[in-house]
Amino acid sequence: MGIARKPEVMSPAGYWPQLEAALDAGADAVYFGLRHFTARAKVGFGLGELPQAMAALHRRGARGFVTFNTLVFDHELREAARALAAIAEAGADAIIVQDLGVLKLARAIAPDLELHASTQMSVTSAAGVRLAESLGARRVTLARELSLADVRAIRAETRCELEIFVHGALCVACSGQCFSSEAWGGRSANRGQCAQACRLPYELVVDGKVKPLGDARYLLSPGDLFALRQIPEIVGIGISAVKIEGRYKDADYVALATRAYRQAVDAAWEGREASIDTRQELDLEQVYSRGWGPHFLNGTDHQAVVRGRAPRHRGVRMGRVTAISETGVTIEPADAHRLSPLKPGDGVVFDAADWRSPQEPEEGGRIFEVLPRGGAMELRFANRALDPARIRRGDLVWRTNDPELEKRIRALPAERLPVSVRVNAREGAPLIAVWEAGGIQVTVESAAPLGAARNRALDAELLREQFSRLGNTVYALADLELAVEGAPFAPASLLNQLRRDAVERLEAAAAAPRRIEIRDPMTTLDEIVSIGMCDRVDRRKRLSHFAGEAMGQAFSPANSSGSGDPPPSLHLLVRTAEQLDAAIDFRPASITLDYLDLYGLKPSLERVRAAGLCPRVASPRILKPGEERVVDFLLSCDCPILVRSAGLLDTLRGRPHAALVGDFSLNAANAITAGELLALGLDSLTPTHDLNAAQVADLARAVGAARCETVAFHHLPVFHTEHCVFCRFLSTGSSYRDCGRPCDEHRLALRDSSGRAHPVMADVGCRNTVFGAEAQQASAHLEAWLSAGIRHFRLEFAHESAAQVVAVSQAFADALGGRLDSGELARKLARVSPMGITEGSLFVPPDYLELPVLQ
């Protein structure tokens, strides 16, 4: 696919100051959220402010994209439908969506409104792009874990618009696949409530023992993305938009980052070499940085993405401490000091060099005086601003704040919208001027014919002099064409009035809301739900029992209970050969194999078959370009597949396959989404872990409980990450090619400040999953789930031994068979689980049905 058009520079806005900063710096588009249904809670515009925000954007020739990129629960769908209609009515240029149900709802309410698939959709392949496009997305924001080679491969296989992040914070977990906030804080990253557990300190536990890592404590905290130097290559790939992260960042950050990428994109598009100097990089680093690089865009390097020293803004490294005295701190300056010297008023922090825990508060403050000391310099501070005892020789010095830079940013000239003017001036006829800016064209003309000039006739110089007086507007005169017949005379007053009229009309036309079809949101929602119910009833008529192949022998008619309902069945997911031995002895309805090495599990599959049991195989949660062989392998297993990505689901639609069970990672949070996924070919579905136990039951009733498989015991997969902790901290390698595969030899866990050790496991793609230390279990909710008609219960094991697998499985079998009440089940599970048990995400808060009304 050729390069169709220049990529948009897309900037973030938390509120008005950031929006205005983005426009002044030349953003083509600005993305922002409302107060709810957005992946960045606590920032955004009120619904009543949206028309004003869109008008401000359109007056500057920019587009406005509203983020609606969270999962939406069933009880919120009516409020969501009203919000979607209001967003369309306000003139939004696009809505950025995570939830497949919201995608369908938005398309039905406003068929002409542009829809973008959020990075929260976890799209990492051409198949994922095609699926999003088939469901109505015009643009897809690709996952930040992709390399430029991956992006180029996806571009070659698709025609949909693609967008990538080029600057700002990185999440350690794949977007849309993080459940740490849900597990540990009762709040969800998929709901805009990220608790930033990745920025907390952890100890590395290897085979049961803590491994010293020096000053590396923040083992899941990645540095920031900085891809300014990769822009020429990105433009050459044919990307539709380059995106700057940062809806929580301030206006200075937005202004500086937008201007830098604006200049880089313009230069690359015009074939010019980008003029990126060290001072510009230092300014960007100063305004906000945790340490940065192109990271995944340049390919895998697990040594570079996470340094582990600090999780917060560092700014620019300005030197190293050489001496400490009662009057001040002497430092040897770094190269950055030559371009951007330290000065009074700067804020600095002293970064302890291997002698103090990075978790402790750091010494720092504002410089009062800078004194040269030969090649060094002494920094002095106000009285008692520092504790000299907490600073030592060798400590790094970072400038975290530069007031002078802030002044320079705010003094930068605002980008203007170029305007072209074509003028026809003929003696004896009205003067006609056509003004065009940002794709909008208006025509103004004089009320009376032009007379003959007695002295100076109208010429281009006079016209430019009057029409270029646009200082208090958003426009700048770029091109002027004049066609003259005779020697017409046009007074300056007339030209000035025509200029004012043209500007007024351009601004009015730009700010006018786009007129698109908007259907009644409540009627539309009711129609979608009604049609979905009919489809589900029809499917149930065609499926007398649910996916017998996928669910194992327990679901044959011979095993049904007298009431016509099948008995409850257990499905075990195992990750080790030892666990498999125990699972086969237990004889569940099915056994799902979720092994590190896919290519070593076929003998295990045969063992399950030989035992007369139903085998299933789990797919990776992420599949990238070049990993298509994994799909071939999954199909060659000739057994049901636990599908964990939408891209894989799309790929399997076109190929013969056994039964498909959709996993939690598909993020089915409401009945519309669940219906869409089932319609795409799934035989059953596991709800997202963002739902509490009551919501799981409600969703099962809505979609048909026979098609729901719930997880009743597991360690919540809190992080799923491209970054490999094994490679980073147990090797000197950068990827699987040179790491020596420590994941084959060692058991790993991350121990948090409370002493909980969270298991870490790698998959076939070397991606890591960090599991919650405590076992999440549904003992308190089994009765309610059974009452909702749920009969499929999955038990998943991480580091459990064979004995623990047997004990947990037997306890659930006894509970489902009526031989154990919920309290006894919980007590048994607690005795089996060394780190304890928890309700975790299944906990049902008393106020969970309350949704703040959008203002």
Predicted regions and their residues:
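Glycine/small-residue-rich interface belts in oligomeric ring/scaffold proteins
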Residues: 45-49, 55
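Short, low-complexity intrinsically disordered segments enriched in A/P/G/S/L with frequent Arg
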Residues: 538, 542-547, 555-561, 565-567
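Glycine/threonine-rich flexible loop motifs
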Residues: 42
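Conserved phosphate-binding/catalytic loop of the ribokinase/pfkB sugar-kinase fold
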Residues: 121, 125
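Surface-exposed amphipathic alpha-helical tracts and adjacent flexible/coil segments at the periphery
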Residues: 1-24, 29-39, 53-54, 60-67, ...
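Contiguous, structured surface segment used for ligand recognition
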Residues: 68, 108
